[in-house]
């Protein structure tokens, strides 16, 4: 899906787990997280500089082959998602891939002290329909693999910049 050694933006990288996997697979990685603590932990884990910035404040300085937003953009209110997704889609090379995941559902609000925007396949497709030059490649609904959470469902989507 991505060229060998391609450049990936890990958007909302959390602990850096996925950034580390991408680095080990030979990709060039840039990572950013909105939590100073998580950005620091990710930097320590990966050995690379991880930027601390919100999705709204971070300005991509490169063009990417892929953007990985695993369980991260779900913390953006639904009303703000079109502008955020469009901003990052514009940082993709033509043919570049954008992975996004959301909890499956229709909730948009606070849950356990944090904001969550859940998505259905229909609401996700409507979101992407409003983003110029981005198309949905594949949507898959999966169960959470963490212990005790098999009843939680996730919407996983691969999009492509055209």
Stretches with model-predicted labels:
Residues 146-162:
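Core SAM-dependent methyltransferase catalytic element
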Residues 9, 15-57:
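Class I SAM-dependent methyltransferase SAM/SAH-binding core
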Residues 95-102:
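Conserved beta-strand signature within the Rossmann-like core of class I S-adenosyl-L-methionine
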Residues 108-123, 146-148:
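Acceptor-substrate binding/catalytic loop of class I
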Residues 82-94:
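A short glycine-rich, Lys/Arg-flanked "PGG" loop and its adjoining helix->strand segment in the class I
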Residues 134-145:
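Conserved S-adenosyl-L-methionine
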Residues 56-67:
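A short acidic, Gly/Pro-enriched loop at the edge of an enzyme's catalytic core
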Residues 66-80:
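A short SAM/SAH-binding and catalytic strip from SAM-dependent methyltransferases
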């Amino acid at each position: 899906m991505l060229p060998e050694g391609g450049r990936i933006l890990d958007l909302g990288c959390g602990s850096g787990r996925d950034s580390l996997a991408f680095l080990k697979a030979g990709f060039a990685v840039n990572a950013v997280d909105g939590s100073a603590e998580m950005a620091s932990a990710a930097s320590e884990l990966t050995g690379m500089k991880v930027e601390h910035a919100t999705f709204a404040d971070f300005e991509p300085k490169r063009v990417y082959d892929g953007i990985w937003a695993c369980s991260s953009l779900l913390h953006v209110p639904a009303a703000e998602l079109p502008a955020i997704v469009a901003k990052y889609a514009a940082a993709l090379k033509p043919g570049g891939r954008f992975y996004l995941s959301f909890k499956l559902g229709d909730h948009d609000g606070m849950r356990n002290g944090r904001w969550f925007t859940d998505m259905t396949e229909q609401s996700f497709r409507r979101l992407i329909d409003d983003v110029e030059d981005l198309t949905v490649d594949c949507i898959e609904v999966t169960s959470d693999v963490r212990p005790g959470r098999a009843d939680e469902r996730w919407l996983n989507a691969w999009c492509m910049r055209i």
